Structures are given as C-alpha cells and as structure tokens.
C-alpha cells in the first residue's frame, strides 16, 4: 500500500479487514513529509526493495492517483468501478479494470507472458 493516509489509519484499515497477510508493506507519505504525486512518495518502495519503477504495478480508483504513479514510471491500473470517464489529464492508464477480481487474471496473464520472454 502506498497512500497519502496516516500509518495509523492504514494499519487500522488493514487489520480491521483481516488483510494483514496480503500486503508486504504499507508506505505512508508521513515518511517523506510530502503528498502524492511528488516523486519522493513513489521512490519509497523503489528504494526499499531496490527495484526499477517499471517493475511496479500501481492501481487506484482515483484518476489523479493513477496518473501520478504512471507518470513516475509505474505500470498504472485504473480501477473503474463505476464505468466513469477518465478525467481530462495528460495521462492515460496502461490498463483499466472494473473490480479487483479482474486483477487476478491480469497478474496471471503478466506472469505467463514473462515466460515467453525467457
């Protein structure tokens, strides 16, 4: 999780929804004292895990959030639950899904595609 929310709020949400074993980490903007879409926010997981930004999938239901992650170089996924039109921004997401269950097939497809490149 990478959020503008406070650590206390984020941990409470994760714990109260029994998602403790789902997420490896929770990153809050409080760690860098600045809000998204500042690049320092998106740098946090990159630095911690020593990975390239194009190896990260970033998903959100908020268009500005998807744009920020995508502009940083993350693979952006817009969760469009309401079949809305993407805001008039200078960025369009890589992929659009209607619900989180679609994420499973998206990840599986990417996993299978990675074998084709070996």
Feature names for model-found ranges:
Residues 2-7, 11-118:
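Asp-based, Mg2+/Mn2+-dependent phosphohydrolase catalytic module
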């Amino acid at each position: 999780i990478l959020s503008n929310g406070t650590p206390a709020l984020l941990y409470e949400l994760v714990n109260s929804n029994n998602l403790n074993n789902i997420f490896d980490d929770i990153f809050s903007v409080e760690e860098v004292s600045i809000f998204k879409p500042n690049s320092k926010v998106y740098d946090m997981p990159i630095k911690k895990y020593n990975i390239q930004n194009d190896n990260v999938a970033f998903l959100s239901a908020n268009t500005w959030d998807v744009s920020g992650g995508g502009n940083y170089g993350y693979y952006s996924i817009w969760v469009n639950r309401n079949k809305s039109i993407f805001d008039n921004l200078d960025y369009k997401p890589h992929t659009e899904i209607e619900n989180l269950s679609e994420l499973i097939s998206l990840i599986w497809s990417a996993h299978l595609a990675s074998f084709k490149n070996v």
